[in-house]
Amino acid sequence: MEKQSPAQTISLFVLLALMFVLVCMLFVPYLTVLLWSSILAILLSPCYRALCARIDMHAFTRTRHLVSHMNGEDGCTAAITRATRFQKKMLAAVFSLVITLLVTTVFFFIAISLFGQGKLLFDKLSLFFREYDLFEGAKQRSFTALIFKLSRGTVDISTLNVEEHLLRFFGKHVESVFVYTQIFVKNIARAALSTLFFSFTLYFFFLDGEHLSCLLIAALPLRKRASAQLLEKCKEATRHLFKGLFSIAFYQTCVAFVFYGIFRVEGPMALAMLTFFASFLPLVGCACVWLPVGISIGFTSGWMRGTLFLFVAGSSITIIDSFLRPLLLQNKMRIHPLLIFFSMLGGVQTFGFNGMVLGPILVILLFTVIDLTHDGESHYTSIFHDPPAAGVHAQSIHRQGKK
């Protein structure tokens, strides 16, 4: 084999990098379609593979029957193979169409509900602030005087209109919901085309997912074992992310939506969506939504009703968080919750709504690559392993110091 010069090697790498960037630019406009179709394919592929296994078992039984009774005619065997392939195609088509229909229906219902209930909730909040004067009166003046005294006259918040700033803050986010909903309604043709692409992509992910995975492994500039490990970790992270974090958030959202409806809270869908996103917050979690809602019920409908809501909703959501989270996670998601939380925030700011999934997956892939670089080192402890106890960790450090 002819040996390449350094200039030829550099030119080859530059050409490879240029082609990689150009191909990425081709797929960027369809990132949302590719991301969510791949996520749903990863989550539902076990069910699809189980049904495909039943089809293969039935085909094997028929083929063995032909071999034993008809001396294995090649034409019949080929016909069974074609029929099996056709059944798998139909199964993938049914999966993709049903999933697309469900996702589109749920998304459209949530978008329309948020459009109406978001405005209603904002109007109710404005009326609540103006009716009860929470930020005016003797308490506000005494608090202002206390801050002025503690700061020795350097901080004066008497001119700060807290009510106006809060309403402006909520109004900004409600307006964002309106804008996105209007864009979705106005671009209904584009949304329909994206839905078609979503169903089309999902079909091929179900049908040829293993082949596409092999192509991706071969395309990565890593050893085959490392590429397979990286891809498997990505699939595992996606499953655990949705099975643990997002499923818990979904259950909490459903429970909160039911209680918002029972207690006739204005804008139950909008508040339920806020509960979904608040479930990822550390320490406070969903309490930053249902607690103010319970207090507002106490102001508007009586403190007995408000206390009952706080007890019922709070205990139900807390039970889900305390018992369901360990049951679903089962020590599978070993990344620290603080990293998951900030990766979601940073992902949303960087990639938009897709960043809620891309952020945690990128963090997990980063630590997977770090594990690959330390492969074979006996003293290295992976972040995906359970952390050792403090005494064991101290003893290991002491032994390493002696060495």
Swiss-Prot record:
<keyword id="KW-1003">Cell membrane</keyword>
<keyword id="KW-0812">Transmembrane</keyword>
<dbReference type="Pfam" id="PF01594">
    <property type="entry name" value="AI-2E_transport"/>
</dbReference>
<feature type="transmembrane region" description="Helical">
    <location>
        <begin position="271"/>
        <end position="291"/>
    </location>
</feature>
<keyword id="KW-0813">Transport</keyword>
<keyword id="KW-0472">Membrane</keyword>
<dbReference type="GO" id="GO:0005886">
    <property type="term" value="C:plasma membrane"/>
</dbReference>
<protein>
    <recommendedName>
        <fullName>Putative transport protein TP_0553</fullName>
    </recommendedName>
</protein>
<feature type="transmembrane region" description="Helical">
    <location>
        <begin position="350"/>
        <end position="370"/>
    </location>
</feature>
<feature type="transmembrane region" description="Helical">
    <location>
        <begin position="293"/>
        <end position="313"/>
    </location>
</feature>
<feature type="transmembrane region" description="Helical">
    <location>
        <begin position="202"/>
        <end position="222"/>
    </location>
</feature>
<dbReference type="InterPro" id="IPR002549">
    <property type="entry name" value="AI-2E-like"/>
</dbReference>
<keyword id="KW-1133">Transmembrane helix</keyword>
<feature type="transmembrane region" description="Helical">
    <location>
        <begin position="10"/>
        <end position="30"/>
    </location>
</feature>
<feature type="transmembrane region" description="Helical">
    <location>
        <begin position="31"/>
        <end position="51"/>
    </location>
</feature>
<comment type="similarity">
    <text>Belongs to the autoinducer-2 exporter (AI-2E) (TC 2.A.86) family.</text>
</comment>
<feature type="transmembrane region" description="Helical">
    <location>
        <begin position="243"/>
        <end position="263"/>
    </location>
</feature>
<feature type="transmembrane region" description="Helical">
    <location>
        <begin position="92"/>
        <end position="112"/>
    </location>
</feature>
